[in-house]
């Protein structure tokens, strides 16, 4: 139902675009540190172990986030998780930009990794759920869009490095890595605004949780589908 009709297809395209926006941010934050690790090592006088700690913190955070993400999604819903994980990106990006030492930077990158680990599986689930079963924009092509989105994010980070390098005065070239990491808060705030405006909870998730009344309400409000749940279905215990 959610993928048929003009209203359903319009909403599905918006959800797919928003999910790809999250993947774009995941890729940007995962790759952004690569451009400034030498400057960070020099500024904080890092040992090889310290450099490894800073560089790997986001990966360890992503592992923990991926493990927590599935549990949280089952408990509170995809939409709530999808909105909350963006807060990790905003807070962590600002903390990275202002980090006074390697420990704060590593901690902020770990928190950012939590956001990546939570966001990516949920984004892929939305891509799969809201894609067509066949024809243009089918599941295979929609899910595969994560790949060019990922490459685009890395390309944008390269362009940002060139831009900031060109505009920063030479006396403040040490700000470059801070600006690149801190810039991640900008798309995160944009994504939060768009998600809050155009997204709702997944009706499929609500139905799978046994909450048929909520699923029907989402279909009516977000997809203009006149869905109602028979009274006898409401009286049956959830599976």
Model-derived regions, located:
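Transmembrane-helix signature of 12-pass secondary carriers
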Residues: 1-239
């Amino acid at each position: 139902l959610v993928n048929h009709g003009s209203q359903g297809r319009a909403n599905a395209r918006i959800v797919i675009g928003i999910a790809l926006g999250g993947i774009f941010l995941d890729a940007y934050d995962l790759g952004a540190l690569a451009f400034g690790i030498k400057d960070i090592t020099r500024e904080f006088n890092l040992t090889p172990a310290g450099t490894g700690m800073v560089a790997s913190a986001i990966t360890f955070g992503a592992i923990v986030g991926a493990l927590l993400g599935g549990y949280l999604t089952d408990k509170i819903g995809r939409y709530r998780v999808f909105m909350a994980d963006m807060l990790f990106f905003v807070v962590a990006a600002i903390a990275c930009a202002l980090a006074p030492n390697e420990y704060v930077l590593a901690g902020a990158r770990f928190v950012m990794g939590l956001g990546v680990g939570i966001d990516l599986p949920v984004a892929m689930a939305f891509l799969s759920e809201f894609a067509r079963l066949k024809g243009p924009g089918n599941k295979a092509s929609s899910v595969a869009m994560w790949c060019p989105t990922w490459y685009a994010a890395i390309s944008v980070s390269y362009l940002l490095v060139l831009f900031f390098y060109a505009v920063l005065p030479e006396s403040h070239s040490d700000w470059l890595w801070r600006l690149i990491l801190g810039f991640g808060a900008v798309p995160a705030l944009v994504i939060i605004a768009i998600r809050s405006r155009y997204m709702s909870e997944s009706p499929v998730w609500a139905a799978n949780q046994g909450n048929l009344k909520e699923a029907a309400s989402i279909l009516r409000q977000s997809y203009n589908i006149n869905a109602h749940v028979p009274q006898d279905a409401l009286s049956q215990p959830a599976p």
